[in-house]
């Protein structure tokens, strides 16, 4: 059977034929790095990691892009709050933290979470702040085509004119009249309350480091514009797959599609959206207290079991967490690992790998993955192979056990279950990287405070690091750090 995916834009499961034979291009939305990653972020990353692994398993050469939104209202607001009198500083949110240091620190926290769960790095991981010229070019194309205009209030904002694009709403199948107003700027400068910001003029009190000069005045890019500019830079004007969480369909992806198509780009041929994570059947909410973080999950189960849990549902389905769910995932992973260990100990030797990875999995597994990435059915094939392998071992049929071992190892490779750091490897990798990134961000904030002659803040950062057992040593080439003896 041909590879098929559910395309959000057409609301149909369609045959997938890559734009370029033998290759595939995938863009999926990364994080706005304003805080620590939550399980929804990590589930989405695992979903698209499995997608990319499967496409590669079929023999395609995949170019993947996952962006980092490192300039945004939420990032600036959180940084601004840390400079206010009475701000209650903490280890997670220190006082007087520059916006760029905050964004970098949390970007590294996301990296650590991804690496801890075996999510491979994409081919490209561009930051929004590094692609402002590309955003200028996209705005200019939209203006030339009559789809964008400067704000009418002199604010320096630039808006996309939704009424000028008759296909606006095609991704989510909504009429403009039924949509919520765009909340991203003061509506007084808009022609229509649904128009959304492509460029946001600088506001009084905003840091100079968060402002770029543009043909329309100083300011910064809008969120939706960033993804359109970065995806097409690395993948071209038309590419195969655009992915992200279900919560991004509107307004983010709707606006991305509109501005890109209106600028003349073919843009994404397929739109894939993964379902959200709930807790006991309810939406996670800090106010209700029914949340769990990736860090907490990793404290309750091994990384491989956490990855299994977050990747086990159909990607379009809601994934529900409940107490005991990770214990169940741990037991399943142990059964898989138990079979592979017993098979090798018994002398079962799988045949040498030959051909594409997708050719070495059972037919039922391949059929499931080709059917809109049906991971639950693929896992059923994996568990059947484990059961058959255990039966072969019990009957001392090493040839059959070896054949099943080869299938199991091929399937776990596709699902990324064989690529999760465990034990000392896990501790030495993502955790140490995260610690280094966190400490360096504080050292950079201290250096900025010293440059500003803000000695109180510089001393406060130094003392906080010392209290945590970190020794900062100033040298001619800058500051370095080490753990206290």
Curated annotation (Swiss-Prot):
Residues 185-197 have a biased composition (Basic and acidic residues). Its cofactor is Zn(2+). Signal peptide: none annotated. It catalyses: tRNA(Cys) + L-cysteine + ATP = L-cysteinyl-tRNA(Cys) + AMP + diphosphate. The keyword Signal does not apply. It is found in: Cytoplasm. A motif ('KMSKS' region) lies at residues 283-287. It is an enzyme of class 6 (ligase). GO terms for biological process: cysteinyl-tRNA aminoacylation. Binds 1 zinc ion per subunit. InterPro entries: Cys-tRNA-ligase, Cys-tRNA-synt_Ia_DALR, Cys-tRNA/MSH_ligase, CysS_C, Rossmann-like_a/b/a_fold, tRNA-synt_1_cat_dom, tRNAsynth_Ia_anticodon-bd. Zn(2+) binds at residues 29, 227, 252, 256. HAMAP family: Cys_tRNA_synth (MF_00041). Belongs to the class-I aminoacyl-tRNA synthetase family. This is Cysteine--tRNA ligase.
């Amino acid at each position: 059977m041909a590879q098929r995916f559910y395309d959000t834009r057409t609301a149909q499961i369609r045959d997938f034929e890559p734009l370029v034979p033998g290759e595939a291009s995938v863009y999926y939305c990364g994080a706005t790095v304003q805080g620590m990653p939550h399980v929804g972020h990590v589930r989405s990353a695992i979903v698209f990691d499995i997608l990319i692994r499967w496409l590669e398993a079929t023999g395609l050469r995949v170019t993947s892009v996952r962006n980092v939104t490192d300039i945004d209202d939420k990032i600036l607001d959180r940084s601004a709050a840390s400079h206010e009198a009475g701000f209650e500083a903490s280890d997670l949110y220190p006082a007087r933290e520059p916006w760029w240091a905050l964004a970098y620190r949390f970007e590294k926290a996301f990296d650590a979470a991804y690496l801890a769960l075996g999510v491979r790095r994409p081919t490209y991981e561009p930051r929004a702040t590094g692609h402002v010229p590309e955003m200028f070019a996209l705005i200019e194309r939209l203006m030339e085509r009559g789809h964008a205009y400067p704000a009418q209030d002199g604010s320096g904002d630039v808006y996309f004119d939704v009424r000028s694009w008759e296909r606006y709403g095609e991704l989510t199948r909504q009429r403009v009249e039924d949509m919520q107003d765009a909340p991203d700027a003061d509506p007084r400068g808009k022609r229509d309350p649904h128009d959304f910001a492509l460029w946001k003029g600088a506001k009084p009190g905003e840091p100079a480091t968060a402002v770029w000069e543009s043909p329309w005045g100083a300011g910064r890019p809008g969120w939706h514009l960033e993804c359109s500019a970065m995806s097409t830079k690395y993948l071209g004007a038309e590419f195969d797959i655009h992915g992200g969480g279900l919560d991004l369909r509107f307004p983010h992806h709707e606006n991305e599609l509109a501005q890109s198509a209106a600028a003349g780009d073919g843009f994404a041929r397929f739109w894939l959206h993964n379902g959200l994570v709930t807790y006991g059947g309810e939406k996670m909410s800090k106010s209700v207290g029914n949340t769990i973080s990736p860090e907490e999950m990793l404290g309750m189960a091994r990384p491989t079991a956490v990855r299994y849990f977050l990747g086990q549902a159909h990607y379009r389905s809601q994934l529900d967490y409940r107490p005991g769910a990770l214990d169940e995932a741990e037991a399943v992973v142990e059964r898989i690992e138990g079979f592979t260990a017993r098979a090798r100990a018994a002398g079962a030797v799988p045949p040498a790998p030959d051909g594409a990875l997708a050719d070495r999995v059972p037919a039922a597994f391949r059929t499931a993955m080709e059917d809109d990435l049906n991971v639950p059915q693929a896992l059923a094939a994996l568990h059947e192979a484990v059961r058959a392998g255990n039966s072969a071992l019990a009957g001392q049929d090493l040839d059959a056990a070896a054949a099943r071992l080869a299938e199991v190892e091929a399937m776990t490779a596709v699902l990324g279950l064989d690529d999760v750091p465990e034990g000392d490897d896990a501790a030495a990798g993502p955790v140490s990287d995260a610690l280094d990134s966190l400490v360096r961000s504080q050292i950079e904030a201290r250096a900025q405070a010293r440059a500003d002659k803000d000695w109180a803040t510089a001393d406060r950062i130094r003392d906080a690091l010392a209290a945590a057992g970190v020794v900062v040593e100033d040298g001619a080439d800058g500051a370095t750090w080490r753990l206290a003896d």
